[in-house]
Amino acid sequence: MMVLYSGTTCPFSHRCRFVLFEKGMDFEIRDVDLYNKPEDISVMNPYGQVPILVEREPILYESNIINEYIDERFPHPQLMPGDPVDRARVRLFLLNFEKELFTHVSTLESRAAKSNEKALEKARSNIRDRLTQMAPVFLKNKYILGENFSMLDVALAPLLWRLDYYG
């Protein structure tokens, strides 16, 4: 059985939870205290972060890698496009999400930044600006790629879910 080591408040962990639930997989979630991680987390992931997926070998970490593995191993419903060119485009969007949105999410989630209101407001502003640029896509389509739920929706959903929390 797959085991997902996951933080209850970690948006990257929530991405993996979405994919596992969307696929209807039988899996176990082991919640990890993000501020007091057990030693075995660093053994499984040299960066000491969650999510981590354990299912035989290899042990996987980093949400986009875990999610692509699950999508390829269990292809229904398909979350990545079948066409290689479209798949490459989705991967570029995922990279853009990381660099243009989730960099700022990391600031908002950081304990160290909690006392730096200027850094928090800058992160909020950057997220707000980028989401405003993306707004036409949300108005036009049911999901980011159109009619079908995809890996792009999985990647963005944890951020959208937390907007009120982030302020």
Range-by-range predicted roles:
Residues 144-167:
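GST superfamily/GST-like fold recognition
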Residues 1-144:
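GST-like domain detector, emphasizing the conserved glutathione-binding G-site
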